[in-house]
């Protein structure tokens, strides 16, 4: 892993929650974009497929 030295600059107790938070934020943004920009996904999500 060539990015292993990042943990010499950022503590894992700060970096890991930050990384997971960014992943969560991106996932929520993608789901929100799909919900607002498609017509079939909200119907499927409500169980009316």
Swiss-Prot record:
<keyword id="KW-0460">Magnesium</keyword>
<dbReference type="GO" id="GO:0019684">
    <property type="term" value="P:photosynthesis, light reaction"/>
</dbReference>
<feature type="transmembrane region" description="Helical">
    <location>
        <begin position="15"/>
        <end position="35"/>
    </location>
</feature>
<dbReference type="InterPro" id="IPR035889">
    <property type="entry name" value="Light-harvesting_complex"/>
</dbReference>
<dbReference type="GO" id="GO:0005886">
    <property type="term" value="C:plasma membrane"/>
</dbReference>
<keyword id="KW-0076">Bacteriochlorophyll</keyword>
<dbReference type="GO" id="GO:0046872">
    <property type="term" value="F:metal ion binding"/>
</dbReference>
<dbReference type="InterPro" id="IPR018332">
    <property type="entry name" value="Antenna_alpha"/>
</dbReference>
<feature type="topological domain" description="Cytoplasmic">
    <location>
        <begin position="1"/>
        <end position="14"/>
    </location>
</feature>
<dbReference type="InterPro" id="IPR002361">
    <property type="entry name" value="Antenna_alpha_CS"/>
</dbReference>
<keyword id="KW-0148">Chlorophyll</keyword>
<keyword id="KW-0472">Membrane</keyword>
<dbReference type="GO" id="GO:0030077">
    <property type="term" value="C:plasma membrane light-harvesting complex"/>
</dbReference>
<dbReference type="InterPro" id="IPR000066">
    <property type="entry name" value="Antenna_a/b"/>
</dbReference>
<keyword id="KW-1003">Cell membrane</keyword>
<feature type="topological domain" description="Periplasmic">
    <location>
        <begin position="36"/>
        <end position="49"/>
    </location>
</feature>
<dbReference type="Pfam" id="PF00556">
    <property type="entry name" value="LHC"/>
</dbReference>
<dbReference type="GO" id="GO:0045156">
    <property type="term" value="F:electron transporter, transferring electrons within the cyclic electron transport pathway of photosynthesis activity"/>
</dbReference>
<comment type="similarity">
    <text>Belongs to the antenna complex alpha subunit family.</text>
</comment>
<keyword id="KW-0157">Chromophore</keyword>
<keyword id="KW-1133">Transmembrane helix</keyword>
<comment type="function">
    <text>Antenna complexes are light-harvesting systems, which transfer the excitation energy to the reaction centers.</text>
</comment>
<dbReference type="GO" id="GO:0042314">
    <property type="term" value="F:bacteriochlorophyll binding"/>
</dbReference>
<keyword id="KW-0042">Antenna complex</keyword>
<protein>
    <recommendedName>
        <fullName>Light-harvesting protein B800/850/890 alpha-3 chain</fullName>
    </recommendedName>
</protein>
<comment type="subunit">
    <text>The core complex is formed by different alpha and beta chains, binding bacteriochlorophyll molecules, and arranged most probably in tetrameric structures disposed around the reaction center. The non-pigmented gamma chains may constitute additional components.</text>
</comment>
<keyword id="KW-0437">Light-harvesting polypeptide</keyword>
<keyword id="KW-0812">Transmembrane</keyword>
<keyword id="KW-0997">Cell inner membrane</keyword>
<feature type="binding site" description="axial binding residue">
    <location>
        <position position="31"/>
    </location>
    <ligand>
        <name>a bacteriochlorophyll</name>
    </ligand>
</feature>
<dbReference type="GO" id="GO:0019866">
    <property type="term" value="C:organelle inner membrane"/>
</dbReference>
<keyword id="KW-0479">Metal-binding</keyword>
């Amino acid at each position: 892993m060539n990015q292993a030295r990042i943990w010499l600059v950022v503590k894992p107790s700060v970096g890991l929650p930050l990384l997971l938070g960014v992943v969560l934020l991106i996932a929520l943004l993608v789901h929100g974009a799909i919900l607002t920009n498609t017509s079939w996904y909200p119907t499927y999500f409500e169980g009316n497929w």
